[in-house]
Amino acid sequence: MIQSKIRIRTKNQSYNVIVGNNLIKDLLKILKNNSISFNKCLLVIDNKVPKKFINKINFLLKKKNKFTYTFNSSEINKSQKTIDKLLDILLKKNFHRTDCLISIGGGITGDVSSFTASIFKRGIKFINIPTTLLAQ
C-alpha cells in the first residue's frame, strides 16, 4: 500500500494529512504515529457507507467510548438542523476539547462534521475518513 503524509502548517498550528488506499486497516497505527489520542469519539456516518466498512472501524475503535450518528448525506441535510443535532449529541454525552469527531463518508458528511468540530468548545479533534474521490 502506498501512503503519503502531507504536513499542513498554518499560522496557529500544524497537522498531517495522510493519503493512501485502504488506510482503514492501519487506522490505530496512523493515530498513534501522529500522536492523536482521545477517550470519546462521535462517528458521523453517511448512510451509504457499507456496513462492512463501519464494522471494521467499530472493531478498531472497540476500546474507545464511541457514539454514532448516521444520516442521509443529501444537500437538504447539509443544514443548521444537522449541525444542531451533532452539537446536541456532543453536549449530552459531555464531550471535551480532548475528544474527537470522526467523519466517515462523502463531501457533505465531511463538511457538516468538520464545521461542527470547529465550533464545538472552540474546536475539538477532527478526523475525516473520505469514502468518495470528491470528498478527499
Predicted regions and their residues:
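ATP/NTP phosphate-donor binding region
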Residues: 1-100
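Glycine/threonine-rich beta-strand-loop-alpha-helix active-site module
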Residues: 78-136
